[in-house]
Swiss-Prot record:
Disulfide bonds: none annotated. This is Cation/H(+) antiporter 19. May operate as a cation/H(+) antiporter. Residues 790-800 have a biased composition (Basic and acidic residues). It is found in: Membrane. The lineage of its organism: Eukaryota, Viridiplantae, Streptophyta, Embryophyta, Tracheophyta. It comes from Arabidopsis thaliana (Mouse-ear cress). Residues 776-800 are annotated as: Disordered.
Amino acid sequence: MASTNVTGQCPGPMKATSNGAFQNESPLDFALPLIILQIVLVVVFTRLLAYFLKPLKQPRVIAEIIGGILLGPSALGRSKAYLDTIFPKKSLTVLDTLANIGLLFFLFLVGLELDFAAIKKTGKKSLLIAIAGISLPFIVGVGTSFVLSATISKGVDQLPFIVFMGVALSITAFPVLARILAELKLLTTDIGRMAMSAAGVNDVAAWILLALAIALSGDGTSPLVSVWVLLCGTGFVIFAVVAIKPLLAYMARRCPEGEPVKELYVCVTLTVVLAASFVTDTIGIHALFGAFVVGIVAPKEGPFCRILTEKIEDLVSGLLLPLYFAASGLKTDVTTIRGAQSWGLLVLVILTTCFGKIVGTVGSSMLCKVPFREAVTLGFLMNTKGLVELIVLNIGKDRKVLNDQAFAILVLMALFTTFITTPIVMLIYKPARKGAPYKHRTIQRKDHDSELRILACFHSTRNIPTLINLIESSRGTGKKGRLCVYAMHLMELSERSSAIAMVHKARNNGLPIWNKIERSTDQMVIAFEAYQHLRAVAVRPMTAISGLSSIHEDICTSAHQKRVAMILLPFHKHQRMDGAMESIGHRFHEVNQRVLQRAPCSVGILVDRGLGGTSQVVASEVAYKVVIPFFGGLDDREALAYGMKMVEHPGITLTVYKFVAARGTLKRFEKSEHDEKEKKEKETDEEFVRELMNDPRGNESLAYEERVVESKDDIIATLKSMSKCNLFVVGRNAAVASLVKSTDCPELGPVGRLLSSSEFSTTASVLVVQGYDPAADTRPLVEEDAEYDQSSRDISDLTA
C-alpha cells in the first residue's frame, strides 16, 4: 500500500486509545481519537467546498482535491502547530492505511461499473477517438518528461519517469466525465455517448499502462524483476478469470430478485477483494489492482451487484475516500513551485496536456466526420482528470519517480484541466433542444381515431400496477398502435456509483433509457414489456437520470420531442396501510409543480390508492367505475375528454356529475373583461357537454347527471356519496372555491386536494388533470423547428 514519506527520525508508534482528559492525557496523542478528528475535519471541509462549487457545476472530486491541498502544507499546513497537532507525522501511517483501504473498495466499485461486454461493442468511431486520445497525449507526455528530467527531476530513473508522465497526461477520468456530462445534460446526446464510450476504452488502457509503469519502477537491480512482476500480474488476471469469476457468478446465481442477499456471500466477496489486493501487493504491482480486477470479473447482472454496491459505496465514498484526497494533499506542497522556471514548467505541462488530448481527439473526430464544434467539445471532455490521475501521481511519488515539485505541478495540472472542462463546454457547446411542432397536445381532439401518445412517469415499482392498469383502461379499442406509451423512470442523479453505471449504459436512441445491467431481472422492465406483448399498446421504457432540481426539463423535453398529448406524474405521497397519506419527499413535490408550469401538453397527477389492487389486471377482468365531477373550465373539459377515452374500454363505467351551483359557491370573476371571459367559458362548457351527449362512444357505459349545490358542504357531501368508485378524474383548476383548509398541495387544485386528503374516506385513486393552454406563458424548453428531423416518428419502430 501507498504510505507517506517521512523524513528525519522515525516517530514512535501511537497507542490506540487514551484514558481521558481527566487523567491528563490528550486524545490527540492517541491513534483512534486523532483519526476520528481527521475524518470529521476532512469530510466537513470537503463537503463545504463541494457545496460552494455546486453552482459552478463542478464535480465533487474538484472540491476533494482542493480540500486536500488546502489542508496540507500548501495552506493550513504552513502552520507548524496545526500540522503537529492535527496531522502529526506519527499519525500519517494510520491515515494512509485507512485511506488506501477505502480506495481499495472504491476501485472494486469502479471495476463493477466497467462492463467489458459493452466495451467490446464500442463502435469504430469511438474506438478510433479513444486510441488517438491516448496515443498523442502519451507521446507528448514522453517529450515533456525529457524537459522535466533535465530541470526539476534530475537523477530519477528515466524509463519509469517517461511512462508515468505519459500515463498522467493521457488519462481520462471515466466517473468524473460521467458526472460532468450528467450535470450538463449531454449524456444521451451523440457527443455524450461518444465521450463515454471512448472514456471506457481509455480507462482500461490507462490501467494497463499504469501496471507497466509500476513494474518498471521497482527497486530491483535486475531488469528481470520487472519481467517477473508483469508475468505474475498476468497470471493473477488469468486466475481471477478462471477461479474468482466462477465463484462470484455462483453466489450471484443464488441471489434471486426480490430476496435478500446472504450475509455470507457479501462477507466472502469482501474477503476475496482484500485477498486479491494482498496478492497483487505481494507481486509488486500494487494492492489496488487486485481489487479492481475482482470488480471487473464480478457479475454485472442481477441483484448481487446492486446489493454489493449499496453496502459498500456510502461508507467508502462518503467517509473513507476523502481521506485519500487529504493524504494526497499532505504530500502536495504548492510552495515548491517557485521561480519563473517552475511556473513556466507548470504552464508547459498544462498546455502540452491540453494540446495532446484535444488535438488528438479533434483530429480523429474530424476523420470520423464529426462536426468541428462537437469535435472540440469532445476534446475538452476527454481532457477530464480525476481520482485515477491522483492514484498514478501518488504511486509515482511513493516510488520516488516523482519528486515534490513534479508531483505538485502534475496535481495542479489535473485540477486545472478538470476545473475548466465544465465552463468551456458550456461556452462552446449549447445543444439546441429542437423538436418538430405538433398539434395533438391535449386529449381533446376532433379525430378520435388519431394516435394518442402518453408519457407515463414513475419513481419506483410501487407506482407500476396502478399506472399499467390506468393505461389499460385508457387504451380503448381498435387498431394496434392507437395508444403509445413512453414509460419514464424518474431517477435522481446522485454521487452513487450505481447511478454512474446507469449513465454508462445509456444507449443510442436520443433519450435516456433503461440500464441494461438490470434489464433481465428488473421488475419494472418486466412489467412494461409483458404488458406490451399482451396488449395492442406500444410501450417504450425510458429513464431520466438527473438532479431533482432539473429533472422536469428532461420530462418536458422528452414530452415535446415524442409529441405526447399527456404527461402522467405520480403524486408525491402514497397511501399507508392505515389509509393516511405519507410523503416520499418534498423535492418530488417540487418536480410535479415545475412540470405543470413548463409542460408542452396536458398533465395528469395520479394519486395512487391502488387502482385494480397491487397487481396488473388482465383486460378481461378490468371493471372500474370512474367518476368525473364537472364544475367547468379548461381543465375539467380535458378531464372529461380523458374520461371519454376511457369509456371506450368495455370494462369501464363512467359517470359524469355536472355541478350546478348557486351564486357564491363557484368562483366569481371580476367585472369588465372577466365577466366576458366567464360567459365564454360557460358557453364552451355547455357546448362541450352537448357534444359529449351526442358522442357515439357514449354507450350504455356512460351516465350523466346534474347536481344542484348551494354551499361548500353540499359539494363535499355530494363527492362523498361518490366515494365507492375506483377512480376520480378531476380538473386541476375547477371553477370552485377551496374545499379544504390545507394549502400544501396546490398542484391538485381545490377538488383534488379534498379527494386526496386523509379526511376523505375512499379507496379510489384520483387523477388530477391540467389541460394544455396555448395562451399560457409556459416558457417552452424546446425550440420548435418545422424542418426538424424527428428520428423516432413512430413509436412502433422503436419497439419492434
